[in-house]
Protein backbone atom coordinates (compact mmCIF):
# COMPACT_ATOMS: atom_id res chain seq x y z
CA UNK A 1 0.00 0.00 0.00
CA UNK A 2 1.30 3.45 -0.98
CA UNK A 3 1.73 6.02 1.81
CA UNK A 4 0.42 9.55 1.18
CA UNK A 5 1.18 12.51 3.45
CA UNK A 6 -1.96 13.95 5.00
CA UNK A 7 -2.32 17.07 7.13
CA UNK A 8 -5.26 17.25 9.53
CA UNK A 9 -6.71 20.76 9.32
CA UNK A 10 -9.66 20.15 11.64
CA UNK A 11 -9.04 18.74 15.14
CA UNK A 12 -12.36 16.85 15.04
CA UNK A 13 -10.67 14.32 12.72
CA UNK A 14 -9.25 11.58 14.90
CA UNK A 15 -11.52 12.60 17.78
CA UNK A 16 -15.15 12.96 16.69
CA UNK A 17 -14.62 11.61 13.18
CA UNK A 18 -12.17 8.96 11.94
CA UNK A 19 -9.43 9.57 9.42
CA UNK A 20 -10.73 8.35 6.04
CA UNK A 21 -10.25 4.60 5.58
CA UNK A 22 -11.30 2.00 3.04
CA UNK A 23 -14.63 0.47 4.10
CA UNK A 24 -13.82 -2.96 2.63
CA UNK A 25 -10.82 -4.79 1.22
CA UNK A 26 -12.12 -4.09 -2.30
CA UNK A 27 -13.03 -0.42 -1.79
CA UNK A 28 -11.46 1.98 -4.28
CA UNK A 29 -12.46 5.18 -2.50
CA UNK A 30 -11.95 6.78 0.88
CA UNK A 31 -15.00 8.66 2.17
CA UNK A 32 -14.59 12.41 2.69
CA UNK A 33 -16.71 14.13 5.33
CA UNK A 34 -18.28 17.58 5.62
CA UNK A 35 -16.19 19.23 8.33
CA UNK A 36 -18.46 22.24 8.73
CA UNK A 37 -19.28 24.25 11.85
CA UNK A 38 -23.04 23.68 11.65
CA UNK A 39 -25.53 21.95 9.41
CA UNK A 40 -27.03 23.83 6.46
CA UNK A 41 -29.23 23.25 3.44
CA UNK A 42 -28.24 23.36 -0.21
CA UNK A 43 -31.18 24.76 -2.13
CA UNK A 44 -32.21 23.37 -5.54
CA UNK A 45 -29.81 24.68 -8.19
CA UNK A 46 -27.35 25.92 -5.54
CA UNK A 47 -23.66 24.97 -5.27
CA UNK A 48 -21.66 25.05 -2.02
CA UNK A 49 -17.94 24.53 -1.39
CA UNK A 50 -17.50 22.27 1.63
CA UNK A 51 -14.28 21.69 3.61
CA UNK A 52 -13.13 18.15 4.41
CA UNK A 53 -10.71 19.12 7.16
CA UNK A 54 -7.78 17.54 5.29
CA UNK A 55 -5.00 18.42 2.91
CA UNK A 56 -2.85 15.84 1.14
CA UNK A 57 0.51 15.89 -0.60
CA UNK A 58 0.83 13.00 -3.03
CA UNK A 59 4.39 13.95 -4.12
CA UNK A 60 4.66 11.10 -6.68
CA UNK A 61 4.16 12.55 -10.22
CA UNK A 62 2.92 9.12 -11.33
CA UNK A 63 -0.15 9.48 -9.06
CA UNK A 64 -3.09 11.84 -8.75
CA UNK A 65 -6.31 11.74 -6.79
CA UNK A 66 -9.85 12.34 -7.91
CA UNK A 67 -12.78 13.43 -5.79
CA UNK A 68 -15.86 11.55 -6.94
CA UNK A 69 -19.52 11.67 -5.88
CA UNK A 70 -21.08 9.08 -3.60
CA UNK A 71 -23.57 7.20 -5.75
CA UNK A 72 -26.46 7.30 -3.28
CA UNK A 73 -26.40 11.09 -2.97
CA UNK A 74 -26.78 11.58 -6.69
CA UNK A 75 -29.29 8.82 -7.31
CA UNK A 76 -31.54 9.37 -4.31
CA UNK A 77 -31.22 13.12 -3.74
CA UNK A 78 -29.81 14.76 -6.89
CA UNK A 79 -26.65 15.84 -5.05
CA UNK A 80 -23.62 15.73 -7.34
CA UNK A 81 -20.23 17.41 -7.50
CA UNK A 82 -20.36 20.93 -8.87
CA UNK A 83 -17.30 20.29 -11.02
CA UNK A 84 -18.32 16.64 -11.75
CA UNK A 85 -14.83 15.35 -10.81
CA UNK A 86 -12.22 17.07 -8.68
CA UNK A 87 -8.64 16.44 -9.80
CA UNK A 88 -5.89 16.63 -7.17
CA UNK A 89 -2.45 16.91 -8.77
CA UNK A 90 0.56 15.30 -7.12
CA UNK A 91 2.13 18.67 -6.26
CA UNK A 92 -1.01 20.24 -4.72
CA UNK A 93 -0.77 20.78 -0.96
CA UNK A 94 -3.86 22.85 -0.16
CA UNK A 95 -7.08 21.90 1.61
CA UNK A 96 -9.39 19.33 0.04
CA UNK A 97 -12.72 21.00 -0.67
CA UNK A 98 -15.83 19.43 -2.21
CA UNK A 99 -18.08 21.41 -4.55
CA UNK A 100 -21.61 20.10 -4.01
CA UNK A 101 -24.47 20.94 -6.37
CA UNK A 102 -28.12 20.28 -5.68
CA UNK A 103 -29.62 19.42 -9.06
CA UNK A 104 -32.72 18.04 -7.34
CA UNK A 105 -36.05 19.74 -6.65
CA UNK A 106 -35.87 19.81 -2.84
CA UNK A 107 -33.47 21.45 -0.37
CA UNK A 108 -30.86 18.98 0.89
CA UNK A 109 -29.47 19.17 4.42
CA UNK A 110 -25.76 18.62 5.05
CA UNK A 111 -25.00 17.65 8.64
CA UNK A 112 -21.65 18.04 10.38
CA UNK A 113 -19.54 14.97 9.58
CA UNK A 114 -21.73 13.65 6.74
CA UNK A 115 -19.87 11.53 4.19
CA UNK A 116 -20.17 13.68 1.06
CA UNK A 117 -17.69 12.37 -1.53
CA UNK A 118 -14.94 9.83 -2.05
CA UNK A 119 -11.24 10.18 -2.78
CA UNK A 120 -9.68 7.74 -5.25
CA UNK A 121 -5.98 7.57 -6.16
CA UNK A 122 -5.21 6.92 -9.82
CA UNK A 123 -2.05 6.34 -11.88
CA UNK A 124 -0.91 9.17 -14.15
CA UNK A 125 0.88 8.99 -17.48
CA UNK A 126 2.29 12.27 -18.70
CA UNK A 127 2.34 12.25 -22.50
CA UNK A 128 4.50 14.07 -24.99
CA UNK A 129 2.91 14.97 -28.34
CA UNK A 130 4.42 13.52 -31.51
CA UNK A 131 3.39 15.64 -34.53
CA UNK A 132 2.33 13.50 -37.54
CA UNK A 133 0.68 14.16 -40.90
CA UNK A 134 -1.58 11.07 -40.78
CA UNK A 135 -2.48 8.27 -38.38
CA UNK A 136 -2.10 4.58 -39.08
CA UNK A 137 -5.62 3.57 -40.24
CA UNK A 138 -7.79 1.55 -37.84
CA UNK A 139 -11.07 -0.26 -38.46
CA UNK A 140 -12.94 2.36 -36.43
CA UNK A 141 -11.30 5.40 -37.99
CA UNK A 142 -13.15 8.59 -37.04
CA UNK A 143 -16.35 6.86 -35.91
CA UNK A 144 -17.63 8.15 -32.58
CA UNK A 145 -20.75 9.20 -30.67
CA UNK A 146 -22.76 6.01 -31.07
CA UNK A 147 -20.61 4.54 -33.83
CA UNK A 148 -20.44 1.10 -32.20
CA UNK A 149 -24.22 0.77 -31.92
CA UNK A 150 -26.70 0.42 -29.10
CA UNK A 151 -26.61 -3.36 -28.49
Curated annotation (Swiss-Prot):
Q: Identify the enzyme class.
A: hydrolase
Any Pfam family hit: dUTPase
Please list the reactions this protein catalyses. Answer: dUTP + H2O = dUMP + diphosphate + H(+)
What are the GO BP annotations of this UniProt entry?
Answer: dUMP biosynthetic process; dUTP catabolic process
Q: List the disulfide bonds.
A: none
Tell me the route in metabolism or biology where this protein functions.
Answer: Pyrimidine metabolism; dUMP biosynthesis; dUMP from dCTP (dUTP route): step 2/2
CDD domains the record matches: trimeric_dUTPase
**E.C. designation(s):** 3.6.1.23
InterPro entries found in the cross-reference section: dUTPase, dUTPase-like, dUTPase-like_sf, dUTPase_trimeric
Name used for this protein in its record:
Deoxyuridine 5'-triphosphate nucleotidohydrolase
